[in-house]
Amino acid sequence: MLGIKICCEIILEKGDEGVIVGPVWPNIRSSVVLREAVINEVSLEFDKTWTLDLNKLLNAITDKTKLVFINSPNNPTGWMLNSSEQQIILDHVRKKNCWLLADEVYHRIVYQGNASSSFLSLSEPDDKLLVINSSSKSFNMTGWRVGWITHPEYLGEHIAKLVQ
């Protein structure tokens, strides 16, 4: 959670827009609101299974959008993007010149079907991509709170200052 808060502190300013694919953990919304940014939530839909209307998400990303937040595999629904959907989203945020914050802490916890792919497998070095991951979920280390942010190199010093 700290990694998500740090990413929001780096990217969002007052009046910016954050697009969130929901449902999400309530603290995600709080991280956006604390920056005095506006939340535009695109909800997953349920009809026998959870799905994301990709067109709704793409249309929600406007010129005011600075950050798109996606938690896949999703907590609490278990919904998960496939790699072709990830590519479409990544291409769109490139076009819109906004940041993609991918919470991938559950990427190793998949019980049916193919394993979750990471946005990192599709990204280029200059992409505005931030990926949150954690040992807490994947390696059953919840009490340790060990996590990391994969980010463009130029953000490293800024992130280090916020952590300290």
Stretch-by-stretch model annotation:
Residues 34-40:
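A short helix-loop-beta submotif of the ANL/AMP-binding
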Residues 40, 44-112:
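Active-site phosphate-binding strand-loop segment of PLP-dependent enzymes
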Residues 11, 31-32, 93:
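Short hydrophobic alpha-helical segments of the AMP-binding
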Residues 1-4, 24-28:
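Conserved coil-to-alpha-helix start sites within the AMP-binding
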Residues 122-164:
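Conserved core segment of the aminotransferase class I/II
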Residues 1-17:
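Phosphate-binding glycine-rich loop
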Residues 16, 37, 95-99, 125-127:
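A short helix->loop->beta-strand "cap" motif at the edges of active sites that frequently abuts
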